[in-house]
Regions:
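Sequence/fold signature of self-assembling virion shell proteins
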Residues: 43-59, 89-222
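Short, flexible loop/turn elements at secondary-structure junctions
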Residues: 7, 82-84, 118, 174
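Alpha-helical scaffold segments that mediate packing/assembly in large oligomeric complexes
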Residues: 1-68, 206-208, 218-221
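Structured, hydrophobic secondary-structure cores that serve as assembly/anchoring elements
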Residues: 1, 61-88
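Subunit-assembly interface segments of extracellular/virion macromolecular structures
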Residues: 13, 17, 21-30, 83-84, ...
Length: 222
């Protein structure tokens, strides 16, 4: 059970990394090719210029939400770095709701589920300080599919290893696809599939439907 939990946790983290990398590619494409119509940035480029208005705040959040126009209600969650979450907590803006079994408090902000992940993008300011990218999601923002390998799980034993004591290796094979709604893949991977670095490039995606139909938005703050 413990091994299974560790394996499951590993693949969840890999899935999260690919979601974040793909979101970074969408953001880069949007800025390069669609005038940044999915992005609201209030971040300052130096520590000296940082104020409450350049950090996560209700006005900036609202502006990011309404890059979707009258489809703003389609957003259901926001993913933030832990430092941004700290700002939200300090502002007393987080409301906690219980899950269906009353065992867990789920953080929400303005009705959106809050997901905290330090894998989200942190970039250096031009002069000093850092900028945090938060991602707002709606249902169906990413499509997900999983295939079945011929041998999805197996244990390999090597008797000659471990000074003759033998070792066992667990092999887990996953075949899955993750793709953002409303975008076509335009890049060419160097290998069999896109690396995280390749997914984050502006050349990897191109939006093919109107902005309001894409349930994604970005907010950049200090």
């Amino acid at each position: 059970s413990q091994v299974k939990n560790r394996v499951d946790s590993y693949f969840v983290k890999q899935w999260q990394r690919r979601v974040i990398a793909s979101a970074n590619g969408i953001l880069a494409d949007n800025v390069a090719n669609d005038s940044g119509d999915m992005v609201k940035s209030v971040a300052a480029e130096s520590i000296a210029a940082q104020t409450a208005a350049t950090k996560f705040n209700r006005d900036a959040f609202t502006d990011a939400v309404f890059t979707m126009g009258d489809s703003a209600q389609d957003l259901t969650a926001i993913a933030v770095h832990s430092q941004v979450m700290a700002t939200m907590v300090k502002n007393n803006d987080i409301a906690y709701v219980e899950d269906s079994e009353g065992r867990m408090n789920i953080p929400t902000y303005a009705g959106l589920r809050v997901i905290v992940d330090d894998g989200l993008t942190v970039t250096a300011g031009t002069t000093s300080g850092v900028k945090y990218t938060s991602v707002l999601f709606g249902g169906g923002a990413f499509g997900y599919g999983e295939g079945m390998s011929a041998v999805p799980v197996e244990v390999e034993r090597e008797a000659s290893q471990g000074n003759g004591g033998g070792t066992e290796s667990l092999w887990v094979r996953k075949t899955w696809l993750l793709h953002p709604f409303g975008f076509k893949a335009t890049g060419t991977p160097a290998g069999e599939s896109f690396t995280l670095a390749e997914l984050a490039l502006a050349t990897s995606f191109d939006r093919v439907i109107p902005r309001k139909n894409v349930p994604l938005a970005f907010l950049i703050t200090n």
